[in-house]
């Protein structure tokens, strides 16, 4: 029987099987022997030991398509990144850092700008101009007014989505709306675990209940703590340009091969930024991250 690990705690792994619910499982010793640790999000083959009590063993961890470190989770299909249009105003450098992280992992990103009900039209237009031109899908929502929530639900269907964003942007309110009447906390897990005993924050998949009219193919959200800073240090500065998709049309047009689009003269990317074809906020954030990576190498 195949399922997905939705939570792991105290040596137990809770596996959601779409057709029959959540099973409390232990991992066989062979995984420890091979140095493999099951992760939340892993697709696994389980052996059911007790159907009534929903207990079993994990027999096999299926091949992972990707893996994140923070949060520790595997097999992410997409990321829903939530920022507010206003109150607080978006921290563009922080947003662009997260986009770079997802580009590096080849995880598609959907941008959700919340609190659009209290935002100026000029601010909404600015966000749209910056990020739609980079090729990212952009939604302007209001958790308070329920704007565009149904559209966001549709893009979550059948996917495992990491939900991320800084504190204070209405992420929790958005989750409450996305869950419709109930978002199962991994089925009966909340009854099996005494949460008071576990104060450490663990990665966890929230299982979205599907509309009865829609075939349930497994929709999950990975909620993450609000972040206030992100460091780009998992790659070299020469790779950074490949994580800004809007640079793509200008790669190869620079005078010098291997141009990093920072110091070199006759650079097509710099020229595009000067002409407004690449937004100055995005280009400036690229330069800031490039210099940060340059300093990392120096030390």
Language-model features: locations:
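Walker A/P-loop
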Residues: 167, 172, 177
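SH3/SH3-like beta-barrel fold
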Residues: 13-17, 25, 46
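Helix-rich effector regions associated with P-loop NTPase G domains
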Residues: 11, 29, 35-52, 62-78, ...
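Canonical P-loop GTPase G-domain recognition
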Residues: 117-169
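Short, structured beta-strand/loop micro-motifs enriched in basic residues and often containing a Trp
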Residues: 21-30
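Phosphate-binding glycine-rich loops and their immediate beta-loop-alpha structural context
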Residues: 86-135
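Short, Lys/Arg- and Gly-enriched loop/turn segments at beta-strand edges
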Residues: 51-61, 89-91
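Structural detector for short beta-strands of small beta-barrel domains
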Residues: 1-9
């Amino acid at each position: 029987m195949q399922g997905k690990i939705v939570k792991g705690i105290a040596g137990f792994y809770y596996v959601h099987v779409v057709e029959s619910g959540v099973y409390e499982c232990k991992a066989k010793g062979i995984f420890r022997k091979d140095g493999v640790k099951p992760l939340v999000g892993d697709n696994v083959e389980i052996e059911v030991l007790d159907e009534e009590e929903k207990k079993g063993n994990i027999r096999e961890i299926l091949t992972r398509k990707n893996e994140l470190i923070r949060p520790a989770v595997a097999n992410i299909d997409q990321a829903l990144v939530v920022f507010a249009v206003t109150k607080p105003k978006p921290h563009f450098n922080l947003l662009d850092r997260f986009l770079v992280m997802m580009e590096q992992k080849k995880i598609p990103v959907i941008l959700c700008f919340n609190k659009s009900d209290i935002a100026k039209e000029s601010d909404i237009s600015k966000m749209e101009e910056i990020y739609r031109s980079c090729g990212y899908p952009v939604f302007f929502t209001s958790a308070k007014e329920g704007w565009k929530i149904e559209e966001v639900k549709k893009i979550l269907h059948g996917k495992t989505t990491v939900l991320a964003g800084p504190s204070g942007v209405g992420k929790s309110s958005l989750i409450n709306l996305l869950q419709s009447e109930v978002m199962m906390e991994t089925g009966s897990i909340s009854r099996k675990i005494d949460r008071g005993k576990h104060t450490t924050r663990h990665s966890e998949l929230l299982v979205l209940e599907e509309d009865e009219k829609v075939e349930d193919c497994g929709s999950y959200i990975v909620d993450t703590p609000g972040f206030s800073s992100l460091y780009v240090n998992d790659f070299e500065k020469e790779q950074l340009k490949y994580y800004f998709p809007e640079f793509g049309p200008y790669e190869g047009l620079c005078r010098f091969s291997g141009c990093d689009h920072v110091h070199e003269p006759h650079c097509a990317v710099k020229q595009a930024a000067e002409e407004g074809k690449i937004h100055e906020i995005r280009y400036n954030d690229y330069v800031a991250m490039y210099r940060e990576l340059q300093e990392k190498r120096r030390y």
